[in-house]
Amino acid sequence: HVDSFLAQHFPRGTGFATDLPAPNDSGDLPLATVRAFSIDDSATTEIDDAFSVQALGERVRIGIHIAAPAVVLARGHAVDTIAKSRMSTVYAPGLKYTMLPDAWIESLSLNEGRELPVLSLYADVDAETRDVLSTESRLERLRIESNLRHDRLDAIVTDTTIAEAQFDSPYAEPLSTLWHVARKLLASREQARGRPEPAGRVDYFFELHGTEE
Protein backbone atom coordinates (compact mmCIF):
# COMPACT_ATOMS: atom_id res chain seq x y z
CA HIS A 1 0.00 0.00 0.00
CA VAL A 2 2.83 2.40 0.80
CA ASP A 3 4.49 1.87 -2.57
CA SER A 4 1.18 2.39 -4.37
CA PHE A 5 0.51 5.60 -2.43
CA LEU A 6 3.99 6.95 -3.13
CA ALA A 7 3.77 6.11 -6.82
CA GLN A 8 0.49 8.02 -7.09
CA HIS A 9 1.27 11.07 -4.98
CA PHE A 10 5.08 11.31 -5.15
CA PRO A 11 5.94 10.11 -8.67
CA ARG A 12 9.24 12.02 -8.52
CA GLY A 13 10.15 10.73 -5.07
CA THR A 14 9.70 12.06 -1.56
CA GLY A 15 12.99 13.93 -1.35
CA PHE A 16 13.88 17.50 -2.29
CA ALA A 17 16.50 18.99 -4.58
CA THR A 18 19.70 19.97 -2.77
CA ASP A 19 20.06 23.35 -4.48
CA LEU A 20 16.82 25.01 -3.32
CA PRO A 21 17.27 28.63 -2.16
CA ALA A 22 16.96 29.58 1.51
CA PRO A 23 13.98 31.55 2.88
CA ASN A 24 14.04 35.33 2.60
CA ASP A 25 14.26 37.57 5.67
CA SER A 26 11.01 38.86 7.24
CA GLY A 27 12.66 41.68 9.17
CA ASP A 28 10.44 44.41 7.71
CA LEU A 29 7.37 43.16 9.61
CA PRO A 30 6.53 44.83 12.94
CA LEU A 31 7.54 42.88 16.05
CA ALA A 32 4.69 41.87 18.37
CA THR A 33 5.07 42.96 22.01
CA VAL A 34 3.65 39.81 23.61
CA ARG A 35 4.96 36.78 25.53
CA ALA A 36 4.22 33.94 23.14
CA PHE A 37 4.35 30.21 23.84
CA SER A 38 3.46 27.07 21.93
CA ILE A 39 1.92 23.82 23.23
CA ASP A 40 2.79 20.56 21.49
CA ASP A 41 3.98 17.07 22.36
CA SER A 42 7.71 16.44 22.70
CA ALA A 43 7.91 14.66 19.34
CA THR A 44 6.68 17.70 17.39
CA THR A 45 9.42 19.23 15.25
CA GLU A 46 7.25 21.52 13.09
CA ILE A 47 5.77 24.04 15.49
CA ASP A 48 3.25 26.08 13.55
CA ASP A 49 1.09 27.82 16.15
CA ALA A 50 1.47 29.69 19.42
CA PHE A 51 -0.55 31.66 21.97
CA SER A 52 -0.21 34.80 24.03
CA VAL A 53 -2.25 36.28 26.89
CA GLN A 54 -2.09 39.94 27.97
CA ALA A 55 -3.91 41.42 30.98
CA LEU A 56 -5.32 44.84 30.01
CA GLY A 57 -7.24 46.01 33.06
CA GLU A 58 -10.84 44.89 32.64
CA ARG A 59 -9.93 43.09 29.43
CA VAL A 60 -7.66 40.23 28.48
CA ARG A 61 -6.12 40.08 25.01
CA ILE A 62 -5.66 36.55 23.69
CA GLY A 63 -3.37 36.04 20.72
CA ILE A 64 -3.52 33.06 18.39
CA HIS A 65 -0.43 33.06 16.20
CA ILE A 66 -0.05 30.92 13.07
CA ALA A 67 3.29 30.46 11.31
CA ALA A 68 3.26 32.27 7.95
CA PRO A 69 5.76 30.73 5.50
CA ALA A 70 4.05 32.53 2.61
CA VAL A 71 5.53 35.80 3.87
CA VAL A 72 9.01 34.68 2.81
CA LEU A 73 7.85 32.61 -0.15
CA ALA A 74 7.24 34.56 -3.35
CA ARG A 75 4.72 33.32 -5.90
CA GLY A 76 6.48 31.17 -8.47
CA HIS A 77 9.45 30.47 -6.17
CA ALA A 78 10.87 26.95 -6.56
CA VAL A 79 9.69 26.00 -3.07
CA ASP A 80 6.28 27.56 -3.78
CA THR A 81 5.90 25.19 -6.73
CA ILE A 82 6.84 22.22 -4.55
CA ALA A 83 4.43 23.23 -1.79
CA LYS A 84 1.56 23.61 -4.27
CA SER A 85 2.22 20.18 -5.72
CA ARG A 86 2.34 18.50 -2.30
CA MET A 87 -0.37 20.65 -0.67
CA SER A 88 0.30 19.28 2.84
CA THR A 89 2.57 17.16 4.98
CA VAL A 90 1.66 13.46 4.91
CA TYR A 91 1.37 11.77 8.30
CA ALA A 92 0.98 8.02 8.78
CA PRO A 93 2.11 5.62 11.52
CA GLY A 94 5.88 5.52 11.23
CA LEU A 95 5.91 7.78 8.15
CA LYS A 96 6.07 11.51 7.52
CA TYR A 97 6.63 13.28 4.19
CA THR A 98 6.85 17.02 4.65
CA MET A 99 5.41 19.69 2.37
CA LEU A 100 8.50 21.89 2.74
CA PRO A 101 12.21 20.99 2.72
CA ASP A 102 13.88 20.39 6.10
CA ALA A 103 15.90 23.61 5.89
CA TRP A 104 12.71 25.64 5.41
CA ILE A 105 10.93 23.85 8.24
CA GLU A 106 13.86 24.52 10.55
CA SER A 107 13.95 28.19 9.50
CA LEU A 108 10.20 28.77 9.94
CA SER A 109 9.25 26.52 12.88
CA LEU A 110 8.17 28.59 15.89
CA ASN A 111 11.06 27.47 18.07
CA GLU A 112 11.67 29.30 21.33
CA GLY A 113 14.06 32.22 21.27
CA ARG A 114 13.42 33.09 17.64
CA GLU A 115 11.55 35.88 15.83
CA LEU A 116 9.45 34.60 12.94
CA PRO A 117 6.62 35.76 10.64
CA VAL A 118 3.11 34.90 11.82
CA LEU A 119 -0.51 35.71 11.13
CA SER A 120 -1.98 36.75 14.47
CA LEU A 121 -5.62 36.85 15.56
CA TYR A 122 -6.15 38.92 18.69
CA ALA A 123 -9.36 38.65 20.67
CA ASP A 124 -10.13 41.04 23.52
CA VAL A 125 -12.33 39.33 26.11
CA ASP A 126 -14.00 40.64 29.24
CA ALA A 127 -11.86 39.61 32.21
CA GLU A 128 -14.94 38.71 34.30
CA THR A 129 -17.52 37.31 31.88
CA ARG A 130 -14.94 36.11 29.30
CA ASP A 131 -17.19 37.33 26.49
CA VAL A 132 -15.37 38.24 23.27
CA LEU A 133 -15.52 42.01 22.84
CA SER A 134 -13.47 42.58 19.69
CA THR A 135 -11.04 40.87 17.31
CA GLU A 136 -8.18 42.01 15.12
CA SER A 137 -5.80 40.27 12.70
CA ARG A 138 -2.19 41.30 12.08
CA LEU A 139 0.72 40.13 9.97
CA GLU A 140 3.81 40.51 12.13
CA ARG A 141 6.96 39.00 13.56
CA LEU A 142 6.64 37.08 16.80
CA ARG A 143 9.27 36.24 19.39
CA ILE A 144 8.64 32.77 20.80
CA GLU A 145 9.39 32.76 24.51
CA SER A 146 8.87 29.06 25.22
CA ASN A 147 7.85 25.74 23.64
CA LEU A 148 5.65 23.95 26.19
CA ARG A 149 5.12 20.19 25.89
CA HIS A 150 1.88 18.30 26.62
CA ASP A 151 3.61 15.26 28.05
CA ARG A 152 5.51 17.36 30.57
CA LEU A 153 2.34 19.10 31.76
CA ASP A 154 -0.08 16.16 31.84
CA ALA A 155 0.95 15.06 35.33
CA ILE A 156 0.33 18.46 36.93
CA VAL A 157 -2.48 20.00 34.87
CA THR A 158 -5.99 18.83 35.78
CA ASP A 159 -9.38 20.53 35.62
CA THR A 160 -8.93 21.47 39.27
CA THR A 161 -5.40 22.87 39.05
CA ILE A 162 -5.91 24.74 35.79
CA ALA A 163 -9.16 26.34 36.98
CA GLU A 164 -7.22 28.11 39.76
CA ALA A 165 -3.84 28.28 38.00
CA GLN A 166 -2.47 26.16 40.83
CA PHE A 167 0.33 24.23 39.18
CA ASP A 168 4.06 24.74 38.90
CA SER A 169 4.63 26.58 35.63
CA PRO A 170 5.48 30.18 34.70
CA TYR A 171 2.56 29.88 32.27
CA ALA A 172 -0.03 28.76 34.83
CA GLU A 173 -1.99 32.03 34.63
CA PRO A 174 -2.03 32.27 30.80
CA LEU A 175 -2.99 28.60 30.46
CA SER A 176 -5.75 29.01 33.04
CA THR A 177 -7.09 32.03 31.15
CA LEU A 178 -7.11 30.11 27.87
CA TRP A 179 -8.90 27.20 29.57
CA HIS A 180 -11.64 29.45 30.99
CA VAL A 181 -12.17 31.24 27.68
CA ALA A 182 -12.30 27.91 25.82
CA ARG A 183 -14.97 26.67 28.24
CA LYS A 184 -16.99 29.86 27.72
CA LEU A 185 -16.80 29.49 23.94
CA LEU A 186 -17.80 25.82 24.24
CA ALA A 187 -20.86 26.80 26.27
CA SER A 188 -21.79 29.41 23.66
CA ARG A 189 -21.51 26.88 20.82
CA GLU A 190 -23.63 24.36 22.70
CA GLN A 191 -26.29 26.98 23.40
CA ALA A 192 -26.40 27.94 19.72
CA ARG A 193 -26.63 24.29 18.64
CA GLY A 194 -29.22 23.40 21.26
CA ARG A 195 -27.29 20.35 22.41
CA PRO A 196 -23.95 19.56 24.01
CA GLU A 197 -20.90 18.70 21.97
CA PRO A 198 -19.86 15.03 22.11
CA ALA A 199 -17.85 14.29 25.25
CA GLY A 200 -15.67 11.46 26.42
CA ARG A 201 -13.80 10.93 23.17
CA VAL A 202 -10.35 9.45 23.67
CA ASP A 203 -7.42 11.24 22.02
CA TYR A 204 -4.98 8.49 21.09
CA PHE A 205 -1.26 9.13 20.72
CA PHE A 206 1.17 6.70 19.13
CA GLU A 207 4.94 6.96 19.36
CA LEU A 208 6.84 4.58 17.10
CA HIS A 209 10.58 3.93 17.26
CA GLY A 210 12.83 2.57 14.54
CA THR A 211 13.49 3.24 10.88
CA GLU A 212 11.71 0.38 9.13
CA GLU A 213 8.62 1.24 7.06
Predicted segment positions?
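Short, flexible coil/linker elements and helix-boundary hinge sites characteristic
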Residues: 10-11, 27
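Boundary/activation segment at the start of structured domains
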Residues: 1-10
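Electropositive polyanion-binding surfaces
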Residues: 16-213
